[in-house]
Regions:
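Conserved beta-strand hairpin/beta-sheet module of binuclear metal-dependent hydrolase folds
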Residues: 1-36, 153-167
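Active-site environment of divalent metal-dependent phosphoester hydrolases
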Residues: 3, 24-25, 49-54, 76-80, ...
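Divalent metal-coordination and catalytic microenvironments
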Residues: 9, 19, 34, 48, ...
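Active-site neighborhood of phospho(di)ester-bond hydrolases with catalytic His/Asp-centered motifs
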Residues: 18-21, 42-50, 70-73, 143-144, ...
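Active-site metal-binding motif and surrounding structural segment of the metallo-beta-lactamase
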Residues: 25-71, 192-197
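Metallo-beta-lactamase
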Residues: 80, 84-143, 150, 158-159, ...
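Accessory terminal helices/loops
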Residues: 106-107, 192-198, 206-282
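An active-site-proximal "capping" alpha-helix that borders the catalytic cofactor pocket
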Residues: 177-202
């Protein structure tokens, strides 16, 4: 799949890198930027553990071994559960001989990331929301529990009016593979209550406040439709209509398929599956 958005923040002590992508070409751009700036990467912030945002960690840390990694502890549960299961499925796909050369390369790169799991784990765990000074730059690191993942980190830079949302905001369709949809709704409420002027989503184009509010409205309407007696077709069509401004031309059919998949597997599945990635009682 595509790489998530990466963001560099300049700090007095060096560069802060938010998310490291998946593919070698993406990694090379990140390393080239740091070299061109003449500053070391002194900190990585991972918004969440999905491999399209974290696979580059190992290579960045190899180039800058002193860098700290700020992330939630959700990676531990992911390594024991979702990522282990995904690896087993991927290995079976490789063994079937049906994978294209590009797919095989991507799978092997993901496996290499899992084999170097320490690079995915935080050296500075984000266990609660709060102000932090990273490399001399004041930032607010916010923890959204049980949202797009078990622990999503979103960053607010008050001085710049900048909010980096990770996959809590994904232009074309919310990626619900490991999501608790209602927890995610709450995270979007917290973002809306933050006085940012510019928002960087996990995938897609940079948004202003009004664009974010429109996307959040589309997200809420999709959940509300799924909770109603509306049909799958009506709910998917509603997403496509409400989020049309964020869906790249030519991606409409793919988005419909993805929205339909998440409708079936996350929003309109049985209660146990629907709450699989939500906080468990007791």
């Amino acid at each position: 799949g595509p790489d998530g958005n990466s963001v560099f923040l300049e700090a007095p002590e060096g560069l802060i890198l938010v998310d490291t992508g998946r593919h070698p070409a993406h990694r090379d751009k990140l390393l080239a930027y740091a070299e061109a700036r003449g500053k070391p990467i002194v900190a990585i912030v991972n918004t969440h553990w999905h491999l399209d945002h974290t696979t580059g960690n190992a290579d960045i840390l190899a180039a800058y071994p002193g860098a700290d990694v700020y992330a939630s502890l959700a990676i531990d549960g992911a390594l024991a559960g979702f990522l282990r299961e995904s690896r087993e499925k991927a290995e079976a796909f490789l063994a079937s001989g049906k994978a294209s050369a590009e797919q095989a390369a991507e799978i092997r790169r993901g496996h290499a990331a899992l084999d170097d799991a320490e690079a995915l784990r935080p050296t500075v765990p984000v266990t609660a929301s709060g102000e932090r000074t990273i490399a001399g730059r004041a930032l607010q690191l916010n923890l959204a529990p049980y949202a797009a993942t078990e622990g999503d980190v979103w960053i607010y830079d008050e001085a710049a009016g900048l909010l980096i949302a990770g996959d809590l905001v994904v232009g074309l369709v919310p990626f619900m593979d490991t999501a608790c949809p209602e927890g995610w709704r709450g995270a979007l409420d917290a973002i809306a209550a933050t006085p940012f002027t510019t928002l960087v989503p996990g995938h897609g184009e940079v948004m202003d406040r009004q664009e974010f509010l429109a996307w959040r409205g589309a997200y809420n309407a999709f959940l509300n439709c799924a909770a109603s007696t509306g049909t799958k077709e009506a709910c998917v069509a509603g997403w496509q209509r409400d989020a049309a401004a964020f869906i790249p031309e030519g991606d409409e059919e793919r988005v419909a398929d993805m929205a339909g998949y998440y409708f079936d597997t996350r929003l309109r599945s049985g209660q146990e599956e629907r709450r699989r990635y939500c906080a468990q009682a007791g």
